[in-house]
């Protein structure tokens, strides 16, 4: 299931970024995609959120590890 969602998201984004800039603005297929500014904003926001999650996870592991060492 997740493979299909990932593939669909990849294809949508690829078409949106690589093909749609060359399609005429009056074409009906332009209505299927968001504005071009979102093509950069969405991936950057997802990447920042992922970096924050990874940083939080690593920080919690380091805090847990230091508590175990201090208890010994």
From Swiss-Prot:
MF (Gene Ontology): enzyme activator activity; enzyme regulator activity
Pfam families (UniProt xref): DPM2 (PF07297)
Endoplasmic reticulum found in the keyword field: yes
Biological process, per Gene Ontology: dolichol phosphate mannose biosynthetic process; GPI anchor biosynthetic process
Keywords, comma-separated and alphabetical: Endoplasmic reticulum, Membrane, Transmembrane, Transmembrane helix
Record localization: Endoplasmic reticulum membrane
Keyword Lipoprotein (UniProt): no
Principal place of residence: endoplasmic reticulum
Gene Ontology CC terms: cytoplasm; dolichol-phosphate-mannose synthase complex; endoplasmic reticulum; endoplasmic reticulum membrane
Ranges annotated as spanning the membrane: 2-22, 38-58
Membrane topology qualifier: Multi-pass membrane protein
Function noted in UniProt: Regulates the biosynthesis of dolichol phosphate-mannose. Essential for the ER localization and stable expression of dpm1.
PANTHER family for the chain: DOLICHOL PHOSPHATE-MANNOSE BIOSYNTHESIS REGULATORY PROTEIN
Subunit: Composed of three subunits; dpm1, dpm2 and dpm3.
Similarity annotation: Belongs to the DPM2 family.
Name the record gives this protein: Dolichol phosphate-mannose biosynthesis regulatory protein
């Amino acid at each position: 299931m997740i493979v299909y969602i990932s593939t669909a998201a990849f294809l949508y984004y690829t078409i949106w970024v690589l093909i749609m800039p060359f399609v005429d603005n009056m074409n009906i297929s332009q209505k299927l995609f968001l504005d071009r500014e979102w093509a950069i904003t969405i991936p950057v926001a997802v990447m920042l959120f992922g970096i924050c999650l990874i940083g939080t996870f690593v920080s919690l592991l380091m805090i847990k590890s230091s508590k175990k060492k201090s208890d010994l």
